[in-house]
Curated annotation (Swiss-Prot):
A Pfam family recorded for this sequence: PSII_Ycf12
Protein name as it appears in the record: Photosystem II reaction center protein Psb30
Reported function: A core subunit of photosystem II (PSII), probably helps stabilize the reaction center.
Keyword Calcium applies: no
Bilayer-spanning residue ranges: 6-26
Summary of subunit composition and partner proteins: PSII is composed of 1 copy each of membrane proteins PsbA, PsbB, PsbC, PsbD, PsbE, PsbF, PsbH, PsbI, PsbJ, PsbK, PsbL, PsbM, PsbT, PsbX, PsbY, PsbZ, Psb30/Ycf12, peripheral proteins of the oxygen-evolving complex and a large number of cofactors. It forms dimeric complexes.
Location within or outside the cell: Plastid, Chloroplast thylakoid membrane
UniProt topology in membrane: Single-pass membrane protein
Thylakoid keyword on record: yes
A Gene Ontology BP annotation from the UniProt entry: photosynthesis
Stored HAMAP family: PSII_Psb30_Ycf12
Source taxonomy: Eukaryota, Rhodophyta, Florideophyceae, Rhodymeniophycidae, Gracilariales
Family according to the record: Belongs to the Psb30/Ycf12 family.
GO CC, alphabetical: chloroplast thylakoid membrane; photosystem II
Length: 34
């Protein structure tokens, strides 16, 4: 049995962990350009 709820939570958590730092870097670079 595959627990899709757990997989969904892990996927969303991984997306937040991976996308979070990228967004911060992009914002800092844009502020640096301005």
């Amino acid at each position: 049995m595959i627990n899709w709820q757990v997989i969904g939570q892990l996927t969303s958590l991984a997306m937040i962990v991976l996308v979070g730092p990228a967004v911060i870097v992009v914002l800092s670079l844009r502020k640096g350009d301005l």
